[in-house]
Amino acid sequence: MSFASETKKELTNLEMKECCEKAELSALLRMNGSLSFSNRRLSIDIQTENAAIARRIYTLLKKGYDVTVELLVRKKMRLKKNNVYIVRLVEKSREILADLHIVRDDFSFIRNISQELIEKKCCKRSYLRGAFLAGGSVNNPETSSYHLEIFSLYKEHNDAICELMNGFDLNSKTLERRKGYITYLKEAEKITEFLNIIGAHNALLRFEDIRIVRDMRNSVNRLVNCETANLNKTIGAALRQIENIRYIDETVGLDILPDKLQEIAQLRRDYQDVTLKELGEMVSGGKISKSGINHRLRKIDEIAEKLRAGETLVKK
């Protein structure tokens, strides 16, 4: 089961107040419902591929409106061939849609979220929970990027969801997609806040556990890569220094170097594996800092380059 499916399953087991049940059900019907007329009767089909969500819708309708509800199961014939669950409401359809502020008394469609549904903060959370159950998805935190989104068919509702989320300081953004619109979050901290808002506390803890391990692993990898790069740089510099010292020795002899450079050249040639700090401790006449040793080695490199360029050197 995917992380998103586990999150939704957890949400379908939450207990709610009556006002919150209405807010959640409104989002579910608005986003997953469709209307049909048969034998002069209006019916509502609420469709989902998640059995737990279908049970949730069925229970909320029975509990809130005491109506006859049918539950149908069909098999998709394309792609994954998953089961499709259809919760069918064949009585009081018009009254329920009006009560959930999805249609007006004249049966015209309401595209925004009614403020009456989300007056209380708990109802705002519940509407977002219903919207996530109906059209939401969230990436597994083990993947390369963090992403949570809620899909809506029309812009007004999508903008209303975005506004509702940003009322909780989530910094959500909207984007037009093929056949609809999405409100999305990209920051891991905002995704965990959203999971907390809608009541997915177990999913939140799992998300955070995986994220912490992942971020720690990435930090270790960055540290190792940095140390490896520094080590390669140090080894490369040491090999270059040794090669230049050998070139000077074979071309004109180390005696051509000033005494201080000659001593460093001989130490670097004889002790190729030691660090600059250790070289500084070997110098006669007192300890020299790493920067001091590095300065002398750069002078030796410059002399080697001058010799390669054909210049004649005289010991100073």
UniProtKB/Swiss-Prot annotation:
Question: What Pfam families is this protein classified in?
Answer: HTH_WhiA, LAGLIDADG_WhiA, WhiA_N
> What Gene3D superfamilies does this protein's entry cite?
Homing endonucleases
User: Mind telling me which InterPro entries this protein's record contains?
Assistant: Homing_endonucl, Sporu_reg_WhiA_N_dom, Sporulation_regulator_WhiA, Sporulation_regulator_WhiA_C, WhiA_LAGLIDADG_dom
Query: Which intervals of the chain form a coiled coil?
Result: none
Which GO biological process annotations does it have?
A: cell division; regulation of sporulation
* HAMAP family linked: HTH_type_WhiA
Function field: Involved in cell division and chromosome segregation.
Please state which protein family the record places this protein in.
Answer: Belongs to the WhiA family.
- Output this protein's name: Probable cell division protein WhiA
Which source organism? Bacillus cereus (strain ATCC 14579 / DSM 31 / CCUG 7414 / JCM 2152 / NBRC 15305 / NCIMB 9373 / NCTC 2599 / NRRL B-3711)
Gene it is expressed from: whiA
